[in-house]
């Protein structure tokens, strides 16, 4: 029997959507990112590459970081989803970002890491954040902020300098991110709101 409804718990609130191609229904081809942004007006998570490569659309699903542009809403039935809007009491005063476009995805990826491993090493943080791209090159300040939140006793400047020790790839970032047609933020379907 074909599913007629999809039920999601988003930021602690339950939503039930009718599945179909009619007005007000969630089409079977609609991504979780589209549902969150268009239907629930949760625009904190961004959709930049639409390929799961940049991490801007990261949300937590059942406590794990996922790229919401790669998941169909109909496949998320019964899942518990937390968006950037659902996080409370954010750490303040670390000034890790510049333009802010990547911020929601990076924060959600960092939250997923810290849920899984509350005290990651600097190298574990670098690896966990390798799927998120910051086009303002704020990677070092992001790593420093996550190290601080994780309670690492390491000197945060040393962590930043060690990131440069590997000259071939100072911070692991997927190279295909630089080929994205949306990297400059000018595609009208991917607004900054």
Please give the residue ranges for each predicted region.
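Signature of N-terminal electron-transfer/Fe-S-associated modules in redox systems
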Residues: 1-193
């Amino acid at each position: 029997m074909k599913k007629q409804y999809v039920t999601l718990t988003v930021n602690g609130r339950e939503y039930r959507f009718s599945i179909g191609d009619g007005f007000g229904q969630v089409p079977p081809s609609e991504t979780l990112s589209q549902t969150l942004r268009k239907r629930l007006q949760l625009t904190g998570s961004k959709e930049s590459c639409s390929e799961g490569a940049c991490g801007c659309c990261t949300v937590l699903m059942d406590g794990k970081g996922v790229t919401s542009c790669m998941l169909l809403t109909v496949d998320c039935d019964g899942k518990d989803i937390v968006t950037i809007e659902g996080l409370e009491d954010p750490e303040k005063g670390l000034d890790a970002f510049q333009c802010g476009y990547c911020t929601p995805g990076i924060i959600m990826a960092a939250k997923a890491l810290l849920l899984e491993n509350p005290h990651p090493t600097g190298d574990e943080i670098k690896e966990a954040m390798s799927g998120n791209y910051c086009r303002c090159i704020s990677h070092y300040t992001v790593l420093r902020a996550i190290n601080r939140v994780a309670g690492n006793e390491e000197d945060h400047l040393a962590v930043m300098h060690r990131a440069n020790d590997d000259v071939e790839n100072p911070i692991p970032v997927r190279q295909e991110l630089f080929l994205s047609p949306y990297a400059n933020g000018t595609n009208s379907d991917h607004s900054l709101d």
